[in-house]
Regions:
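Short alpha-helix in the alpha/beta-hydrolase fold that links the catalytic acid
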Residues: 229, 238, 252-261
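Alpha/beta-hydrolase active-site loop
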Residues: 127-148
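Conserved alpha/beta-hydrolase
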Residues: 101-123
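Short beta-strand/loop motif that positions the catalytic acidic residue
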Residues: 235-237, 242-244, 248
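The serine-hydrolase catalytic nucleophile loop
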Residues: 90-103
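Catalytic histidine-centered segment of alpha/beta-hydrolase-like enzymes
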Residues: 275-289
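An N-terminal hydrophobic leader/cap segment in hydrolases
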Residues: 4-63
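Hydrolase active-site cap/lid region
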Residues: 168-222
């Protein structure tokens, strides 16, 4: 009997250790330091501090439905009803969204860049890869429409987790924008985790994912199965441009292809030749901008 208890205790200890480790890695993924992001963007020529400081803008605070504040910056150099919201990727912050905002400023849009929960200056205790973030995005959309009018022309651009968040918002809550640009989204979080685990430790994800999911449900009150953009993409009617690098080895381009294939209505697809994950714009600037221009011309602007 004592041996049985020791065995059961060892199994329980193993499961608990795996569960805590996996859920911690997901909930508290190490974020990039803001100084690192600023210096990276400056050195690459994607951030000009002087030009940015000279923009007409204001810092805003928008309450999340989960009790923390979302920190955002509203940039309004133009007297226009055209706005775009930029949704950044995991471990990044709104500084990394400036390059995308500039792309739209050059096309006559005003913009909002903001920090996801637990990123940048926003509150929030953990990261949920789109599950809670989609409700925060709705708060940003609601605030903008309340302040600027429901008749605005609104676009949302998302990168990586930010793109997945955008799809979960548009397909799972409300199709609240006039157009969307999804840059390197994952189609299903469980499928992504399975791939990443196999790449990192050469073991099938089915060993670890159920344990991680059990602990996520207990600690963060969400389930991995609920983070599945592919389950919601067909509910989005507004036009969407899908972008992905062919050489992305973190979120495979096949995931974007699946999303594109299932999306109904107006849509376009652009596969960038150069760059790895979330580098399509950085490594293919002219082609990226042309893809955006072609999309806007065909589906958004007459």
């Amino acid at each position: 009997m004592r041996k049985l208890f020791r065995y059961l205790f060892s199994v329980l200890l193993f499961i608990t250790s795996i569960g805590l480790y996996c859920s911690n890695r997901l909930m508290y993924m190490k974020k990039k330091d803001n100084d690192f992001i600023v210096n990276r963007e400056k050195e690459a020529g994607r951030l000009d501090p002087v030009s940015y400081e000279n923009l007409t803008k204001q810092e805003i605070t928008i309450p999340s439905p989960y009790g923390y504040d979302l920190k955002a910056i509203l940039v309004e150099p133009f007297d226009t009803k055209k706005y775009v919201i930029i949704s950044h990727g995991v471990t990044e912050n709104k500084t990394s969204s400036i390059k995308y905002m500039n792309l739209f400023l050059e096309r006559g849009f005003n913009g909002i860049i903001y920090d996801h929960r637990r990123h940048g200056e926003s509150g929030g205790k953990n990261t949920s890869f789109g599950y809670y973030e989609k409700f925060d995005l709705k708060q940003i959309v609601d605030w903008l429409k309340q302040e600027k009018g429901k008749d605005i022309l609104l676009g949302i651009h998302g990168e990586s987790m930010g793109a997945a968040t955008m799809i979960l918002y548009a397909g799972g809550i409300e199709d609240g924008a006039d157009f969307y640009i999804a840059d390197c989204p994952f189609s299903d979080f469980k499928e992504l985790l399975d791939y990443v685990i196999k790449q990192e430790i050469k073991l099938p994800g089915k060993i670890f994912i159920p344990i991680a999911n059990l602990f996520l449900r207990a600690r963060a009150r969400y389930s991995i199965k609920d983070i599945s953009p592919i389950s919601f993409i067909d509910k989005i009617k507004s036009p969407m441009l899908f972008i992905h690098s062919k050489k992305d080895d973190f979120i495979l381009p096949e995931m974007t292809q699946k999303l594109f294939d299932k999306k109904k209505g107006p849509k376009k697809l652009f596969f960038a030749v150069n760059g790895t994950h979330a580098q399509s714009y950085n490594e293919n600037k002219e082609a990226y901008e042309k893809a955006v221009d072609d999309f806007l011309k065909e589906y958004v602007q007459s």
